[in-house]
Amino acid sequence: MLYWLNELSDGGDVFNLFRYITFRAGGAFFTALIFGFIFGQPLINALRRKYKDGQPIREVGPAHETKAGTPTMGGLLILAALSLATLLWARLDNPYVWLVLGVTWCFGLIGFADDWAKVSRNSSAGVSGKVRLAIGFVVAFGAALIAAWVHPEELSNQLAMPVFKDVLLNMGWMYVPFVMIVIVGSANAVNLTDGLDGLAIMPVMIAAGTLGVIAYAVGRVDFTDYLDVHYVPGTGELLIFTAGLIGGGLGFLWYNAPPAAVFMGDTGSLALGGALGAIAVCTKHEIVLAIVGGLFVAEAVSVIVQVLYFKATGKRVFLMAPIHHHFEKKGWAEPQVVIRFWIISLILALIGLATLKLR
């Protein structure tokens, strides 16, 4: 919205700054951060009044018993902060901005319904997993069709291969189901990761920051020529979305830091995971998402392996899944698990960024 202030510029005044994506990304970051700081505590108070029992806690160990009564749905704070920041600072005539916002809010609503079902029944059983997956795939199907439509014709239905120069794999009709798997898989992988105080939000912010840099790079023809990557005009505006996500995420982390005063719930985890998947699709960096979000992949794979192996043999591979609970069972303190997983996320993000140059 504020982008249009640049039309008031004569070329040498403050209004000219609104032309620049980097300036507006900074504005989005601070807008979301300040919003989170201001409205975080009022939201927590409102959630405590509305849902006195808080989120039902899975019985993992004695350390988790103290979390009973902690309010959930804190993802609403992140969603509101990043949406306000994006609507204020991004170009609203950009289809990628609306695509990512739409996916984020649709998955946020799926998560909200699940959170509401849990707290209203005071049960860890929310909306059926099959129902959530079905709705998620419908949303992702719509996103895939829109992405194929808004991408340049030479990139539509193409899968970019990292490291290799200008290598695109034409997926044809398989592109749509592939995108559906990327978005739904990303949403649910982040959801599985959100099991400890602060565990999910920092890796999400790291991944978002990395994808934001990639979106900015592939949205500039000079950068793509230098890096030998495909050019996707318009994706640079997604840097503003990711900046708002990071600002809102930090505002949320202020209250989610151990011991957490609020959980993001499925409202936040599904929304943020869906957002990461949508950004990867828009920028044609779906494979890089698997690297940058490798922690989320590991969490999801640990659950799949645990379930399949148990059904086949009656035995477990891990002491408990997702894998962060396995390390808790091994004797790691919760802060150890969280911070070590943050470090892993940062390393994976650097590897993901390196794929831009390693060609």
UniProtKB/Swiss-Prot annotation:
**Listed transmembrane segments:** 27-47, 70-90, 97-117, 133-153, 167-187, 198-218, 238-258, 261-281, 287-307, 336-356
GO cellular component terms given for this protein = plasma membrane
Which pathway does the protein contribute to? Cell wall biogenesis; peptidoglycan biosynthesis
What is the enzyme's main class?
transferase
Q: How does it sit in the membrane?
A: Multi-pass membrane protein
Per its UniProt record, the required cofactor names are: Mg(2+)
Q: Which GO terms describe its molecular function?
A: metal ion binding; phospho-N-acetylmuramoyl-pentapeptide-transferase activity; UDP-N-acetylmuramoyl-L-alanyl-D-glutamyl-meso-2,6-diaminopimelyl-D-alanyl-D-alanine:undecaprenyl-phosphate transferase activity
Cysteine disulfide links? none
Q: Pfam families annotated for this entry?
A: Glycos_transf_4, MraY_sig1
Q: Which family does it belong to?
A: Belongs to the glycosyltransferase 4 family. MraY subfamily.
User: What is the name of this protein?
Assistant: Phospho-N-acetylmuramoyl-pentapeptide-transferase
